[in-house]
Amino acid sequence: MKFFIDSADVEEIRKAHAMGCVDGVTTNPSLLAKVGRGLEETIREICSIVDGPISAECVSMEADELIKEGRSLAKIHDNVVVKIPMGVEGMKATKALTAEGIRTNVTLCFSANQALLCAKAGATYVSPFVGRLDDISQDGMELISHILEIYRNYEHFNTQVLVASVRNPVHVLQAARLGADVATLPYNVITQLANHPLTDAGIKKFLADWEKVPKAAKPPAAK
Protein backbone atom coordinates (compact mmCIF):
# COMPACT_ATOMS: atom_id res chain seq x y z
CA MET A 1 0.00 0.00 0.00
CA LYS A 2 1.26 3.46 -0.86
CA PHE A 3 1.29 6.27 1.68
CA PHE A 4 0.43 9.83 0.72
CA ILE A 5 0.65 12.66 3.24
CA ASP A 6 -2.49 14.76 3.55
CA SER A 7 -0.98 18.18 4.09
CA ALA A 8 -0.12 21.51 2.50
CA ASP A 9 2.48 22.26 5.18
CA VAL A 10 5.83 22.07 3.40
CA GLU A 11 7.80 21.46 6.59
CA GLU A 12 5.53 18.56 7.58
CA ILE A 13 5.95 17.12 4.11
CA ARG A 14 9.75 17.44 4.32
CA LYS A 15 9.85 15.65 7.68
CA ALA A 16 7.55 12.84 6.54
CA HIS A 17 9.45 12.44 3.27
CA ALA A 18 12.71 12.10 5.21
CA MET A 19 11.23 9.01 6.89
CA GLY A 20 11.17 7.27 3.52
CA CYS A 21 7.49 6.39 3.58
CA VAL A 22 5.84 9.12 1.49
CA ASP A 23 4.84 8.20 -2.06
CA GLY A 24 2.67 11.24 -2.81
CA VAL A 25 0.73 14.18 -1.36
CA THR A 26 -2.91 15.23 -1.19
CA THR A 27 -3.98 18.82 -0.61
CA ASN A 28 -7.33 20.59 -0.43
CA PRO A 29 -8.58 24.17 0.04
CA SER A 30 -8.89 23.72 3.81
CA LEU A 31 -5.27 22.60 4.13
CA LEU A 32 -4.09 25.50 1.96
CA ALA A 33 -6.08 27.97 4.06
CA LYS A 34 -4.48 26.53 7.19
CA VAL A 35 -0.96 27.35 5.96
CA GLY A 36 -2.00 30.66 4.40
CA ARG A 37 -0.21 30.18 1.09
CA GLY A 38 -1.32 30.29 -2.54
CA LEU A 39 -2.13 27.08 -4.37
CA GLU A 40 0.35 27.28 -7.24
CA GLU A 41 3.41 28.26 -5.19
CA THR A 42 2.61 25.58 -2.62
CA ILE A 43 2.09 22.84 -5.21
CA ARG A 44 5.32 23.75 -7.00
CA GLU A 45 7.32 23.54 -3.77
CA ILE A 46 5.69 20.25 -2.80
CA CYS A 47 6.56 18.84 -6.23
CA SER A 48 10.20 19.79 -5.63
CA ILE A 49 10.20 17.67 -2.46
CA VAL A 50 8.14 14.60 -3.37
CA ASP A 51 8.52 12.88 -6.73
CA GLY A 52 5.08 11.31 -6.83
CA PRO A 53 1.40 12.10 -7.38
CA ILE A 54 0.44 15.49 -5.91
CA SER A 55 -3.31 16.14 -5.71
CA ALA A 56 -4.48 19.72 -6.24
CA GLU A 57 -8.21 20.39 -5.92
CA CYS A 58 -10.62 22.19 -8.23
CA VAL A 59 -13.17 24.50 -6.62
CA SER A 60 -15.55 24.99 -9.55
CA MET A 61 -18.98 23.38 -9.57
CA GLU A 62 -19.86 23.19 -13.28
CA ALA A 63 -18.27 20.62 -15.59
CA ASP A 64 -16.95 23.16 -18.11
CA GLU A 65 -15.30 25.19 -15.35
CA LEU A 66 -13.93 22.07 -13.66
CA ILE A 67 -12.36 20.99 -16.94
CA LYS A 68 -10.82 24.42 -17.49
CA GLU A 69 -9.52 24.55 -13.92
CA GLY A 70 -8.23 20.98 -14.15
CA ARG A 71 -6.24 21.76 -17.28
CA SER A 72 -4.71 24.77 -15.55
CA LEU A 73 -3.74 22.75 -12.48
CA ALA A 74 -2.22 19.99 -14.60
CA LYS A 75 0.10 22.54 -16.21
CA ILE A 76 1.72 23.40 -12.87
CA HIS A 77 3.78 20.19 -12.85
CA ASP A 78 3.77 16.76 -14.48
CA ASN A 79 3.12 15.14 -11.08
CA VAL A 80 -0.11 17.03 -10.43
CA VAL A 81 -3.27 14.95 -10.10
CA VAL A 82 -6.45 16.98 -10.48
CA LYS A 83 -8.82 16.56 -7.57
CA ILE A 84 -12.48 16.65 -8.62
CA PRO A 85 -15.51 16.79 -6.27
CA MET A 86 -17.90 13.84 -6.56
CA GLY A 87 -21.17 14.56 -8.38
CA VAL A 88 -22.76 14.62 -11.82
CA GLU A 89 -20.68 17.61 -12.94
CA GLY A 90 -17.60 16.05 -11.44
CA MET A 91 -18.15 12.85 -13.40
CA LYS A 92 -18.44 14.80 -16.64
CA ALA A 93 -15.19 16.60 -15.87
CA THR A 94 -13.45 13.38 -14.85
CA LYS A 95 -14.38 11.69 -18.12
CA ALA A 96 -13.21 14.67 -20.19
CA LEU A 97 -9.92 15.17 -18.33
CA THR A 98 -9.16 11.45 -18.43
CA ALA A 99 -9.69 11.48 -22.20
CA GLU A 100 -7.03 14.22 -22.38
CA GLY A 101 -4.55 12.13 -20.40
CA ILE A 102 -4.90 14.17 -17.21
CA ARG A 103 -4.91 12.13 -14.00
CA THR A 104 -7.83 12.65 -11.63
CA ASN A 105 -8.65 12.01 -7.99
CA VAL A 106 -12.39 12.09 -7.27
CA THR A 107 -12.87 13.30 -3.71
CA LEU A 108 -15.69 13.28 -1.16
CA CYS A 109 -16.83 9.75 -1.98
CA PHE A 110 -19.19 8.28 0.60
CA SER A 111 -20.85 5.34 -1.17
CA ALA A 112 -19.91 2.32 -3.26
CA ASN A 113 -22.25 3.53 -6.00
CA GLN A 114 -20.29 6.77 -6.21
CA ALA A 115 -17.05 4.79 -6.45
CA LEU A 116 -18.55 2.65 -9.22
CA LEU A 117 -19.32 5.80 -11.21
CA CYS A 118 -15.76 7.03 -10.68
CA ALA A 119 -14.35 3.83 -12.17
CA LYS A 120 -16.75 4.04 -15.11
CA ALA A 121 -15.63 7.64 -15.76
CA GLY A 122 -11.98 6.56 -15.74
CA ALA A 123 -10.79 8.29 -12.56
CA THR A 124 -7.20 7.55 -11.59
CA TYR A 125 -8.10 7.56 -7.89
CA VAL A 126 -11.27 7.59 -5.83
CA SER A 127 -11.07 9.01 -2.30
CA PRO A 128 -13.60 7.50 0.13
CA PHE A 129 -13.69 9.42 3.43
CA VAL A 130 -13.67 6.83 6.21
CA GLY A 131 -13.36 9.12 9.24
CA ARG A 132 -16.31 11.29 8.29
CA LEU A 133 -18.48 8.19 7.88
CA ASP A 134 -17.37 6.95 11.30
CA ASP A 135 -18.35 10.36 12.69
CA ILE A 136 -22.00 9.76 11.72
CA SER A 137 -22.01 6.20 13.11
CA GLN A 138 -21.46 4.50 9.75
CA ASP A 139 -18.60 2.08 9.09
CA GLY A 140 -16.04 3.78 6.89
CA MET A 141 -13.95 0.65 6.45
CA GLU A 142 -16.95 -1.36 5.37
CA LEU A 143 -17.25 1.09 2.48
CA ILE A 144 -13.60 0.45 1.54
CA SER A 145 -14.29 -3.29 1.58
CA HIS A 146 -17.32 -2.90 -0.70
CA ILE A 147 -15.47 -0.69 -3.19
CA LEU A 148 -12.51 -3.07 -3.39
CA GLU A 149 -14.84 -6.03 -3.88
CA ILE A 150 -16.62 -4.27 -6.75
CA TYR A 151 -13.41 -3.17 -8.44
CA ARG A 152 -11.93 -6.67 -8.23
CA ASN A 153 -14.98 -8.07 -9.97
CA TYR A 154 -14.12 -6.13 -13.13
CA GLU A 155 -10.60 -6.40 -14.54
CA HIS A 156 -11.07 -3.40 -16.82
CA PHE A 157 -11.48 -1.03 -13.84
CA ASN A 158 -8.15 0.71 -13.22
CA THR A 159 -9.25 3.24 -10.58
CA GLN A 160 -7.16 3.05 -7.40
CA VAL A 161 -8.78 3.23 -3.96
CA LEU A 162 -7.23 6.10 -2.00
CA VAL A 163 -8.41 5.89 1.61
CA ALA A 164 -8.95 9.41 2.95
CA SER A 165 -10.12 11.07 6.17
CA VAL A 166 -7.79 8.75 8.07
CA ARG A 167 -7.91 9.55 11.78
CA ASN A 168 -5.66 7.00 13.48
CA PRO A 169 -3.27 4.05 12.99
CA VAL A 170 -6.16 1.58 13.24
CA HIS A 171 -7.62 3.04 10.05
CA VAL A 172 -4.25 2.52 8.35
CA LEU A 173 -4.01 -1.10 9.49
CA GLN A 174 -7.56 -1.84 8.38
CA ALA A 175 -6.96 -0.26 4.98
CA ALA A 176 -3.77 -2.30 4.49
CA ARG A 177 -5.47 -5.55 5.49
CA LEU A 178 -8.27 -4.91 3.02
CA GLY A 179 -5.75 -4.28 0.24
CA ALA A 180 -6.42 -0.60 -0.47
CA ASP A 181 -4.06 0.90 -3.02
CA VAL A 182 -3.26 4.09 -1.12
CA ALA A 183 -3.96 5.74 2.23
CA THR A 184 -3.45 9.47 2.66
CA LEU A 185 -2.41 10.30 6.20
CA PRO A 186 -2.06 13.46 8.27
CA TYR A 187 1.46 13.98 9.57
CA ASN A 188 0.47 13.13 13.14
CA VAL A 189 -0.86 9.72 12.05
CA ILE A 190 2.36 8.99 10.14
CA THR A 191 4.41 9.63 13.29
CA GLN A 192 1.99 7.58 15.39
CA LEU A 193 2.68 4.59 13.14
CA ALA A 194 6.32 4.65 14.25
CA ASN A 195 5.52 4.69 17.96
CA HIS A 196 4.63 1.99 20.48
CA PRO A 197 4.85 2.17 24.29
CA LEU A 198 6.83 -1.08 24.45
CA THR A 199 9.33 0.30 21.93
CA ASP A 200 9.76 3.40 24.11
CA ALA A 201 10.14 1.27 27.24
CA GLY A 202 12.66 -0.99 25.52
CA ILE A 203 14.79 1.92 24.34
CA LYS A 204 14.72 3.46 27.81
CA LYS A 205 15.90 0.18 29.37
CA PHE A 206 18.65 -0.37 26.79
CA LEU A 207 19.99 3.15 27.37
CA ALA A 208 19.89 2.70 31.15
CA ASP A 209 21.70 -0.64 30.90
CA TRP A 210 24.28 0.83 28.54
CA GLU A 211 25.31 3.24 31.28
CA LYS A 212 26.21 0.19 33.42
CA VAL A 213 28.45 -1.37 30.78
CA PRO A 214 32.18 -0.88 31.57
CA LYS A 215 33.72 1.47 29.07
CA ALA A 216 37.25 1.10 27.71
CA ALA A 217 39.69 3.52 29.28
CA LYS A 218 40.77 6.34 27.02
CA PRO A 219 44.43 6.10 25.93
CA PRO A 220 46.72 8.66 27.55
CA ALA A 221 47.20 11.83 25.59
CA ALA A 222 50.41 11.97 23.54
CA LYS A 223 53.13 14.20 24.99
Swiss-Prot record:
Catalytic activity of the protein: D-sedoheptulose 7-phosphate + D-glyceraldehyde 3-phosphate = D-erythrose 4-phosphate + beta-D-fructose 6-phosphate
Entry EC number(s): 2.2.1.2
Keywords: Cytoplasm, Pentose shunt, Schiff base, Transferase
Domain of life: Bacteria
Gene Ontology CC: cytoplasm
PROSITE patterns referenced in this protein's UniProt entry, alphabetically: TRANSALDOLASE_1
Active site: 83 (schiff-base intermediate with substrate)
One of the record's GO molecular function terms: aldehyde-lyase activity
Protein name: Probable transaldolase
InterPro entries: Aldolase_TIM, TAL/FSA, Transaldolase_3B, Transaldolase_3B/F6P_aldolase, Transaldolase_AS, TSA/FSA_arc/bac
Gene, per the UniProt record: tal
Family according to the record: Belongs to the transaldolase family. Type 3B subfamily.
Pathway(s) per entry: Carbohydrate degradation; pentose phosphate pathway; D-glyceraldehyde 3-phosphate and beta-D-fructose 6-phosphate from D-ribose 5-phosphate and D-xylulose 5-phosphate (non-oxidative stage): step 2/3
Subcellular location: Cytoplasm
SUPFAM superfamilies on file: Aldolase
